[in-house]
């Protein structure tokens, strides 16, 4: 691999250096991930990066970004692309990494709160099972992993499972 952590330096140039391991999407202390794709009919910046990563990166490079990139927002973006390409494999990684305590500022419209990356991923998968072709078996595997996770109280979906009045 090259210094950016990717196997193809052309890919890094093609997506405006977002794949460099030390570059977050924004130069600030708090990295934000936007849950909504559009806001006031303009596509959010991260989803433009998402389109570029999807266009120029191989599946292996997307997996590498999801697992190893130092930007948590890029981890999330790459995970969503991985989920589109291979839902079973992405869910297996989600379960393997469920105790990850890294946080992001998850923003929906203009409201944002710090949330664990595991929680954001679980909510993404469980809310969009049909969109990403996640099997019932994989969904049940996620439920079991959440219930047995060491950091289950940091995963919003845990409360959905334990309180019938909660919603994703």
Task: Show which residues each predicted segment covers.
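Extended repeat-based scaffolds of very large eukaryotic assembly and lipid-transport proteins
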Residues: 2-168
């Amino acid at each position: 691999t090259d210094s950016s952590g990717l196997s193809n330096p052309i890919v890094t140039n093609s997506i405006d250096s977002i794949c460099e391991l030390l570059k977050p999407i924004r130069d600030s202390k708090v990295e934000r991930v936007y849950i909504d794709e559009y806001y006031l009919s303009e596509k959010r910046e991260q989803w433009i990066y998402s389109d570029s990563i999807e266009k120029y990166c191989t599946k292996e490079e997307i997996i590498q970004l999801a697992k190893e990139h130092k930007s948590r927002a890029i981890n999330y973006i790459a995970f969503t692309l991985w989920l589109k390409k291979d839902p079973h494999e992405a869910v297996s990684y989600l379960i393997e990494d469920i105790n990850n305590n890294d946080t992001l500022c998850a923003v929906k419209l203009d409201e944002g709160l710090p949330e664990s990356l595991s929680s954001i991923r679980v909510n993404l998968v469980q809310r969009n099972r049909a969109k990403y072709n996640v099997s019932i078996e994989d969904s049940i595997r996620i439920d079991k992993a959440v219930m047995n996770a060491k950091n289950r109280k940091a995963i919003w979906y845990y409360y959905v499972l334990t309180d019938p009045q909660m919603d994703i």
